[in-house]
Design a protein with these regions (language model features):
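Acidic/histidine-rich, surface-exposed loop or edge segments in extracytoplasmic proteins
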Residues: 73-75, 138-142, 567
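Contiguous, structured surface segment used for ligand recognition
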Residues: 29-131
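Histidine-centered catalytic/metal-binding microenvironments
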Residues: 514-587
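N-terminal secretory signal peptides that target proteins for export/translocation
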Residues: 1-13
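Sec-dependent N-terminal signal peptides
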Residues: 17-27
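N-terminal structural segment of carbohydrate-active enzymes
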Residues: 90, 131-174
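Catalytic-core regions of glycoside hydrolase
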Residues: 103, 107-118, 137-141, 162, ...
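Second-shell loop/turn segments in exported
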Residues: 77-82, 142-147, 220
Length: 587
């Protein structure tokens, strides 16, 4: 026999071809069972969950640039694919809700799936997302709800975001560290820094340029803690396909900056008649570029870079006198782009913002406008001069407990905006001042972009089954009653109708806290009936955590509604001198 010898020169070309073919095969197969997703599954469902579900990122699934997920089967297991990481995790959330009938929300962020049947779909389901962006959070959320959260709580929240397909969350943790480092670099003493940086419960309004120093000073251990927490939060967000929105630099400086630094910084007066606002460094000042460079450099050390930066000069007031507004907005935008060339300015549409000069100063594609209160006081009707915008639900003003919302208006409003401005209505957002209440609204909002309009009509029935793990006409009816009453606020009322029992004792209670009302806008009989309906299912559902939470919430709402009318009755009896009825009322 003759020994066969391979000619390296001849074999060289086929080897290259083989290598290319293997590479193409790997690309076509996508990324199977990505580690961040496997870890997510084990966190939310218990160890071993990732071994029971096949997952894959397959970019070729995308449909005309829109994200897609598919739910099918492979190797006898559920198989969930997404065109992106966030599409994949949204698909997992959809599978849990609508196949496994397990609904994870703030009252129940994890579960044990070890003994739960995971259905293997016989037919593949495909969903295309109409929203390029799914935004989440409000500056206020960081103070009303998140000020003292631990790493463990943040981990669960980011998992919740992933399951809801959120790909653009506001990220503020660590910004106080950035400012401390920046101010030290430009010559501020620790005492001066302490007078400027607000405490954790008030940093939302500090970062929106409404106040300075309130609730501080912060100890050294706090800054160390926040820097470590910031690193974890941003790393986990990015692992799960989210692009954090970081706070950019638009001229914020301590109120003494004009004297301290010798810059042209305008006095911004007071916010809410009592809080000293930070000064505004006029962006045409010769030192603006240098200070912006220092800010972004210090921020990159702590938070990294982003393609999205949030800035809202003159938020809820401030003085624009003597400022070339178009020049100022253009300078702010230019510095952001110098630091991150492909970045976009995320700006809140709230009260006077964004001003006409702002829309004129920045080119198309430069802004991403958050129509902050679309569900109650929309401003998107004129289309923001062609700038891209997001339809947002602003919920839970003041971080108060109670049932309130606009479920039907949310479902219809998003579709209406998409029809009117298909070119620049780019997505959806939840911009709550506080969270951890009314989970139905957030489940509806973030499923909206993955549904057709026709599917909205019977969504409550599907939600009820997902929420409690079983079909129940009684629970479905209860939610329909709530959706047509307390979750159907007909006005722009900012938040819940506060319970009179929480107010200072008086026969004429109109509000409990600032910017609120105790007035009731809904049919309280429907809420009472919903509570009674839910109680009917106690024997069957008492062991379910979502049922226990919802029953408590709805009964509480029914009782606080009753207290409003009871107080009015007592007050009327007092005014009439009807002692007997008065005594019955307060007893």
């Amino acid at each position: 026999m003759h020994e066969m010898k391979l000619n390296p020169t001849v074999f060289k070309c086929p080897m290259k071809i083989l290598t290319i073919l293997i590479a193409m095969l790997l690309v076509s197969c996508g990324t199977r069972n990505p580690a961040p997703v496997a870890e997510l599954l084990d966190r939310i469902g218990g160890e071993g969950t990732s071994g029971r579900i096949e997952t894959q990122i397959e970019s070729d699934l995308a449909e005309e640039g829109k994200e897609v997920f598919e739910i099918g089967s492979r190797k006898g297991k559920p198989f969930i694919q997404g065109s992106s990481m966030s599409a994949l995790t949204a698909g997992i959330g959809w599978y849990l809700n609508h196949y496994v009938h397990v609904n994870l929300s703030w009252n129940n962020l994890t579960t044990d799936l070890s003994g739960v049947h995971l259905p293997v779909p016989a037919v593949k389901e495909r969903r295309t997302c109409s929203a390029d962006y799914r935004y989440y959070l409000n500056y206020c959320t960081y103070s009303y709800s998140m000020a003292f959260w631990t790493r463990e709580r943040w981990e669960k929240e980011i998992d919740w975001m992933a399951l809801h397909g959120i790909n653009l969350p506001l990220a503020l943790v660590g910004t106080d560290v950035v400012w401390k480092n920046m101010l030290e670099e430009i010559g501020y003493s620790r005492a001066e820094i302490d007078r400027f940086i607000a405490g954790p419960g008030f940093q939302a309004w500090w970062l929106m340029y409404n106040l300075e120093g309130w609730g501080g000073p912060n100890p050294d251990w706090w800054y160390k803690r926040q820097e470590e927490l910031c690193s974890f939060i941003l790393r986990r967000m990015r692992e799960l396909g989210m692009e954090p929105v970081l706070p950019g630099y638009c001229g914020l400086l301590p109120s003494d900056a004009a004297d301290k630094l010798g810059v042209k910084a305008t006095d911004q007066g007071y916010w809410c008649s009592g809080f000293t606002r930070p000064s505004f460094l006029v962006p045409t000042d010769e030192k603006f570029d240098d200070l912006a460079e220092i800010y972004y450099r210090q921020q990159e050390k702590v938070m990294g870079k982003s393609r999205y930066y949030s800035m809202d000069p003159f938020h809820e007031g401030g003085s624009t006198g003597g400022i070339d507004l178009k020049g100022a907005y253009n300078a702010i935008y230019s510095q952001m782009r110098r630091h991150s060339p492909d970045s976009r300015w995320v700006i809140q549409s709230w009260q006077e913002n964004p001003r006409k000069e702002a829309l004129e100063a920045v080119p198309q594609g430069g802004y991403l406008v958050l129509d902050l209160f679309s569900d109650g006081s929309p401003k998107w009707m004129d289309g923001y001069d062609g700038h891209d915008f997001l339809w947002c639900m602003l919920h839970n003003f003041g971080g108060r407990v109670g049932m309130h919302g606009r479920l039907d208006a949310t479902m219809k409003g998003y579709s209406e905006a998409l029809r009117k401005y298909p070119g620049n209505m780019k997505g959806i957002g939840a911009t709550p001042e506080g969270i951890e209440t009314n989970p139905i609204l957030y489940d509806a909002l973030f499923e909206l972009p993955w549904m057709t309009e026709d599917e909205c009509a019977d969504w409550i029935g599907r939600y009820s089954e997902a929420r409690y793990g079983t079909e129940s006409d009684v629970m479905k009816q209860a939610w329909e009653l709530l959706a047509s009453s307390v979750l159907a606020c007909p006005t722009s009322q900012q938040g819940v109708s506060e319970p009179v029992v929480c107010a200072r004792p008086s026969l004429d209670v109109r509000s409990v806290s600032a910017w609120s009302t105790c007035g009731i806008y809904h049919d309280v009989a429907k809420v009472r009936k919903a509570a009674a309906d839910m109680l009917e299912e106690k024997d069957r559902l008492a062991g379910h955590p979502n049922y226990r939470y919802d029953l408590t919430d709805v009964v509480r709402q029914a009782l606080t509604d009753s207290s409003y009318f009871l107080l009015n009755d007592v007050a009327d009896s007092w005014k009439r001198g009807d002692k007997e009825n008065f005594r019955k009322g307060y007893e």
